[in-house]
């Protein structure tokens, strides 16, 4: 449908923006993380979008990054999580924090988001496990660091540690560590735990 919108930012009324594209103005709902990255009104912007058609409304949601949009799409697939709740989650925590909370099964972190209760948080942890990029939040975002952390994670899993234990150990390893040093540091951390 509508995958991207490019135009002039007319106004901002959180969480809604008004974007003018060739004389047509679109209302776009965005998470706070995207809102913080916006330029001043009157400037050009580009947003990745998700277009949702329901029997009573048509809505356009905008995101600064592909990871935000993909996280939103994964969230709205979950029973009981609508677009407003998904926006609240992405406004209350970054995609990296969400991925970490899901990977570590920390429902308590999710309940800190307004509108997310204990049951919804547990459902999010259960249904999103393995669906968000596993490297998010583990490394600083550098391709080599992500590859290294992925290798270290796989090695710790192959050695019989649970995903939760391996991810906790991975958090203790600096991003610029080599694979062999990372495995060694991870094993050292896990032997103390």
UniProtKB/Swiss-Prot annotation:
Region (Flexible linker): 139-143
Gene it is expressed from: ruvA
Protein species of origin: Polynucleobacter necessarius subsp. necessarius (strain STIR1)
NCBIfam families assigned to the protein according to its UniProt record, in alphabetical order: ruvA (TIGR00084)
Keyword Cytoplasm found: yes
A GO cellular-component term linked to this record: Holliday junction resolvase complex
Domain notes: Has three domains with a flexible linker between the domains II and III and assumes an 'L' shape. Domain III is highly mobile and contacts RuvB.
Keyword Disulfide bond in record: no
Compartments reported by the entry: Cytoplasm
Record keywords, A-Z: Cytoplasm, DNA damage, DNA recombination, DNA repair, DNA-binding
Classification via SUPFAM superfamilies: DNA helicase RuvA subunit, C-terminal domain (SSF46929), Nucleic acid-binding proteins (SSF50249), RuvA domain 2-like (SSF47781)
Gene Ontology process terms (BP): DNA recombination; DNA repair
Name of protein: Holliday junction branch migration complex subunit RuvA
Subunit structure: Homotetramer. Forms an RuvA(8)-RuvB(12)-Holliday junction (HJ) complex. HJ DNA is sandwiched between 2 RuvA tetramers; dsDNA enters through RuvA and exits via RuvB. An RuvB hexamer assembles on each DNA strand where it exits the tetramer. Each RuvB hexamer is contacted by two RuvA subunits (via domain III) on 2 adjacent RuvB subunits; this complex drives branch migration. In the full resolvosome a probable DNA-RuvA(4)-RuvB(12)-RuvC(2) complex forms which resolves the HJ.
One Pfam family from the record: RuvA_C
Renumbered residue ranges of the record's region Domain III: 144-193
Region Domain II, residue ranges: 65-139
InterPro entries membership: DNA_helicase_Holl-junc_RuvA_I, Hlx-hairpin-Hlx_DNA-bd_motif, NA-bd_OB-fold, RuvA, RuvA_2-like, RuvA_C, RuvA_C_sf
Record's function text: The RuvA-RuvB-RuvC complex processes Holliday junction (HJ) DNA during genetic recombination and DNA repair, while the RuvA-RuvB complex plays an important role in the rescue of blocked DNA replication forks via replication fork reversal (RFR). RuvA specifically binds to HJ cruciform DNA, conferring on it an open structure. The RuvB hexamer acts as an ATP-dependent pump, pulling dsDNA into and through the RuvAB complex. HJ branch migration allows RuvC to scan DNA until it finds its consensus sequence, where it cleaves and resolves the cruciform DNA.
Any one Gene Ontology molecular-function term assigned to this protein's record: ATP binding
């Amino acid at each position: 449908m509508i995958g991207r919108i490019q135009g002039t930012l007319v106004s901002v009324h959180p969480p809604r923006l008004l974007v003018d594209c060739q004389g047509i103005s679109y209302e776009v709902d965005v998470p706070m993380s995207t809102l913080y990255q916006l330029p001043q009104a009157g400037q050009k912007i580009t947003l990745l979008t998700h277009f949702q058609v329901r029997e009573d409304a048509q809505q356009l949601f905008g995101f600064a990054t592909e990871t935000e949009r993909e996280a939103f799409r994964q969230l709205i697939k979950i029973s009981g999580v609508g677009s407003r709740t998904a926006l609240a989650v992405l406004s209350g925590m970054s995609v990296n924090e969400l991925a970490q909370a899901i990977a570590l099964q920390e429902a308590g972190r999710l309940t800190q988001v307004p509108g997310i209760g204990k049951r919804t948080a547990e459902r999010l942890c259960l249904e999103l496990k393995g669906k968000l990029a596993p490297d998010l939040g583990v490394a600083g975002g550098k391709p080599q660091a992500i590859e290294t952390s992925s290798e270290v994670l796989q090695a710790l899993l192959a050695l019989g540690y649970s995903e939760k234990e391996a991810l906790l150990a991975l958090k203790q390893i600096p991003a610029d560590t080599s694979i062999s040093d990372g495995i060694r540091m991870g094993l050292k951390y896990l032997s103390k735990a």
